[in-house]
Amino acid sequence: MKQNYILSIILCYLLANVHSAPAIITVWQTVTDAQVAAGPTAAAPAANANANVQQAAAASAPAPAPVASPAAPAPASSAPQSSTPSSSGWLSNLFNSFFGGSDSDSSSGSDTASAAPASTSPQSSSSSSSSSGNSFLSFLSGLFGSGSSSSTPSSISQQQQQQQGSPASGSNSPNSAQPDAAAASNPVPQSNNNQGSGLGSGFGSGFGSGSGSDSDSGSGLPSASSSTIIQQQPSSSNIGSSSTSSSSSSSSSSSSSSSSSGDIYAAISQCDGIDASFASEILDAHNKYRAQHKVGDLSWDVDTYNYAKNNADNYDCSGVLTHTHGKFGENLAAGFKDGASTVAAWVDEPISYSDASFVYNHFTQVIWKGSTKVGCAYKDCRKSNWGLYVVCEYDPYGNVIGQGSKNVFP
């Protein structure tokens, strides 16, 4: 009676834990997964555990189903396999184990548990103490030995093939492709100025920076970023007139339109919309004063004229004189009746020939030896009581700090 009571309790316990059987098989999967993760050194414990299971199964079942060799287990990243062991195999082993008293090795559960690494999936404790002792271990052996589990060698073999055929991690992943290092970049427009060494050393204190990409007149010509200018507006002897001069930031290339034969007027006829009489008059006025200071004549130039004309055409006749800070030397004036009187006003400024006290102004630009070409234009502002607005551009530019004594003579 007592034996039947104990048997009933054990049977109820086992029936209540029938659904734990897949979890026990998951423990075996974890063992084989650990072998994949740890390499050949982890294969020995898994093999020993499997040998113990097969040894215990041999005592209770004459023809156990083969178990896949741990030498080529399923990949560690594979999902747990669904396993539905048949009740005809393990249930008969259950009764045989209770009534037959199999002497299986009690270390199989502990070996299995010790070989299994820490896992994030919950596992049943196969090594816990049980009231059935060795009989319960025989029950475990029956599960592995004679059950017709769906985790067949063929399914494990397919997983082995997938593992062998899969590429190495990250070796062929599109995400590992590096972006093209050659990033397209927009080129910065280059200014076509040729600065001399004198500009870099000059235009120090007392002079404002004249950098800028466009002139106030709307000119689209490029300008250097390191230009410096002289911003002075001395009053002229004529009432209501004012003038200002500028040294631009860069020297321009020689204009092909300038006369190579020495005819300083040749380029006048090549200019569009020009007042030829005004051009000849203002050119002569420049060269008159240059001759007095022992420097060569200026020649009329198409490029400087076009630049000056663009400035003059966009002037608003306000009487405010604003330099364009372009690539040429520049003199401005407003309130005069013609070109000759304009140049006379520029020349009527004080001048010093000493390096220590040299003054850069309109006058020094007019007679600057290094400047060889000029182009001038005007806008009629007499309706606004400002006479003619006159613009003259010089190439190469003058008024370079530190170069005064080499370009301006008594």
Curated annotation (Swiss-Prot):
It is found in: Secreted. Keywords: Secreted, Signal. Residues 283-394 form the SCP domain. Its main location: secreted. GO terms for biological process: sexual reproduction. Residues 64-86, 102-132, 148-260 are annotated as: Disordered. GO terms for cellular component: extracellular region; extracellular space. Coiled coil: none annotated. Induction: Expression is specific to in opaque cells, in presence of lactate, and during hyphal growth. Expression is repressed in response to alpha pheromone. InterPro entries: CAP_dom (IPR014044), CAP_sf (IPR035940), CRISP-related (IPR001283). Residues 1-20 form the signal peptide. It comes from the Eukaryota. Residues 197-211 have a biased composition (Gly residues). Residues 148-179, 212-260 have a biased composition (Low complexity). Secreted protein that acts as a virulence factor during infections. Belongs to the CRISP family. This is Secreted protein PRY1. It comes from Candida albicans (strain SC5314 / ATCC MYA-2876). The lineage of its organism: Eukaryota, Fungi, Dikarya, Ascomycota, Saccharomycotina.
